[in-house]
């Protein structure tokens, strides 16, 4: 069992990190979050935090806007999501699916299917932060989700990234 901070990262963050490998090429209002995602992934690669995501993220990270995706984008998604060196994938299970359903039944948290699975996965494995830029489901329900012990935040709002990684967040390449 690890005592390292556990962070859940939503698929939209991986897509942006691959799309804007140079954070300065992103829209101005997204650059800080992209730099933080890059640092969170580097912190995970160095073992300072544990980054989790649902195995569903593999299916969601199909491209960064271009069709078909470039070989480099495919390589990045594979190396980050399935190498086991940066991100710890969590397989869906009946327990996670029931927890996703119960978000609505027991907690009045209304989320679409994939968002419910993501939040339930983060709760099931004990993550303290759920990082997303998706302003719809999880962010709209952030207060209710926080009552379950999970903060829904943008990457730049993380409190779990070690300070030495925060200082290194200048234009880094996606791992």
Feature-to-residue mapping (PLM):
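Conserved glycosyltransferase catalytic-site signature
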Residues: 11, 55, 112-119
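Short, flexible loop segments at the rims of nucleotide/cofactor-binding pockets, characterized by
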Residues: 27-30, 106-111
């Amino acid at each position: 069992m690890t005592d390292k901070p556990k962070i859940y990262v939503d698929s939209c963050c991986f897509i942006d990190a691959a799309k804007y490998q140079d954070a300065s090429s992103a829209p101005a209002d997204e650059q800080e979050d992209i730099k933080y995602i890059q640092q969170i992934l580097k912190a995970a690669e160095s073992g300072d935090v544990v980054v989790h995501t649902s195995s569903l993220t593999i299916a969601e990270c199909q491209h960064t806007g271009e069709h078909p995706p470039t070989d480099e984008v495919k390589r990045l998604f594979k190396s980050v999501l399935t190498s086991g060196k940066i991100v710890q994938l969590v397989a869906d299970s009946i327990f996670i699916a029931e927890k996703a359903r119960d978000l609505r039944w027991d907690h009045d948290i209304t989320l679409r299917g994939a968002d419910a699975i993501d939040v339930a996965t983060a709760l099931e494995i004990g993550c303290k932060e759920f990082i997303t830029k998706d302003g719809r489901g999880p962010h709209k329900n952030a207060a209710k989700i926080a009552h379950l012990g999970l903060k829904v935040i943008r990457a730049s709002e993380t409190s779990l990234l070690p300070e030495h990684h925060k200082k290194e967040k200048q234009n880094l390449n996606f791992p």
